[in-house]
Amino acid sequence: MFSSTAQELEESDHFNVNLDFETRTSILLSKMTLKEKISQLGNNAPAIPRLGVLEYNWWNECLHGVARAGTATVFPQAIGMAATFNPNLINDVAVVISDEARAKHHEALKNNDYSQYKGLTFWSPNINIFRDPRWGRGHETYGEDPYLTGQIGTQFVKGLQGNDPKYLKLVATAKHFAVHSGPESERHFFNANVNQRDLWETYLPAFKDLVIDANVYSVMGAYNRVNGESASASNYLLQEILRDKWGFNGYVVSDCGAINDIHANHKIVKTPEESAALGIITGCDLNCGGIYQRYLQESVTLGLISEKEIDTAVYRLFLARMKLGMFDPAEIVSYAQIPFDINNSQKHDELSLKTALSSMTLLKNNGVLPIDINKINKIAVVGPNADNINALLGNYHGTPSSPVTFINGLNDYVGKRAEITYSIGVDLVKDGADGLNLLSDSIIKDVKRADLAVFVGGLDATWEGEEMPGGINIDGFYNGDRTRIEMPEIQQNAIKAMIDTGTPVVLVLMAGSSIALNGLEKELEAILMAWYPGQRGGNAIASVLFGDYNPGGKLPVTFYSSTSELPDFKDYNMSSGNGFTYRYYKGKTLYPFGHGLSYTKFKYSKLKVNKIRLTEKEKFKISFTIKNIGNYNGDEVVQVYIKDLNSEFQMPIKQLRSFERISLNKKDEKIIEFEFIPIKDLRYYNSTKQKYMVEKGSFEIQVGSSSEDIRLKKIIYVD
């Protein structure tokens, strides 16, 4: 509150808590000049002292923990959260993130700190489809499947935004709407050409889920064009689909600099005044950048836009701030009471560990795992990610107070029960600089003498991530993206040298995307995909290797055998070439979508369908029994896919339509039930009629442990 006008402001109706937010927002808007309105349309919005409006920075991030705002609990990267196949767990994660975000925000207010990364509007989650493993930002997403992405994303948003009937806890932002997955180096001028079926069946469903099921309050437009229109200024995407079809009632923000791209790079218009007007008119309310604030006044003068059109955007933004409680006394906003000391608390740290454990995905095991500590005297650890904090964190991360790398976690677990030798061995990538490119003789000797060797490699966000202009351009990597999916050669050579010693070798991969192993998978005894596992990653990996935790994670992406199997990176047609993702890929996978082993075994049986013939609007139920027939307690992710058996046109090979992560003690069994409805679960998008439809004919219900490990099948018929 501004003291010089405190009494007047207290009497102002836009501070009157007895009025609804919509009325208060309209009152505030009516008092603002055009200049003041325009000033609020950038991510860095200045104060309006005469109206009691505090300055506000809209830019904040919380992809897997509160990011870039000091110490915070760091959870596994988004792709690792997807590997849990556990939406309820991810809701718990998001609740913790939003608790820490609220606590940080109110602590900042006490110190009159209104700077970037201190607000309550967060530009997370990233729900783009991880179409191609070469895309550098894929690890920010929930993987390649629209259904899984929608389920995980929905619970993440619900956890962030809270369940108070009046106030928003935070504003979550679904990004990047709507067809966006590389190349990073071309994102400011690239045009993603996409057909209507791929748009509605692959790229839009997760956004629709978050808008309709999670009531996400903000959507971010992408940098690139989609079929010729800027995604951040597309009437088709932002008005016809988002608001008219889906009923979205929040606000839209551009990606940072995307409004400038409209004239500067996409060449859709010629001037910044035109870009500013086009952005507002098509439904982009907030510009991350300064184009609106610098040029909208002139846009009005030139007759490109009216003040009334600007009012719509300003109203949406202030309504969001009202709903966050920014114009109400803190004592009546429940979320404002969250204490600062919950930040990075022990309870939150334990949830980070639990999530990391749940994300661990066992790709191969010849029986060497779990390690029996009583039968091992010496372990040789080699690899560039064994003590690499960056490999815990991914990108868009906070600062963990006590990060645990793999070698730290291993030492904590083993203690004095076995001897551990460790060497980085080689760098992640041979980048032309002086570095570690070959294993030394002393390392080879350590491996030979060991009972078991562990190579910890993969990538980190230095090599795969957001656009790196003027940055990385070496063999296999280009400005954030990968140009090849094979493991860097110096790591391959190191693993080969270790295998040649005759000592059993376990590979721990820390990465955010699929990695081809050039045949090494045949010679390795075990492979564990650990993703970027967050602040307790080292403890989680050690617990899995020694059997204290039985892994149950599943791949949210396909692992391909080689780059040569992939279609053109710039082709957004899902069925091009060999096809993108498990839904269209016709080649042989290295490890399929949904794959993940356990130390125990599960038996599926007794699949029943309550209706074999039905109409498109009739619900049907399936049930089956799953039993843990192994020697360990464990988790299994049961997966249900549906395959169209007699389509007259190209359909996905199969599509995930439900899943559940269950825990079963050894010898226990459980009956699992799912319900479906054809018009939702068996549909396709008819481009001619511009609506979802169901083909009449036969469909196969597939139940299994992965997209390729199908244990039970039944055929149903839609009349």
Give the residues covered by each predicted segment.
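Extracellular/periplasmic metallocenter environments
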Residues: Q690
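Short beta-strand elements
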Residues: D709-D719
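Glycoside hydrolase catalytic-domain context in secreted enzymes
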Residues: F2, A6-Y684, M693-E708
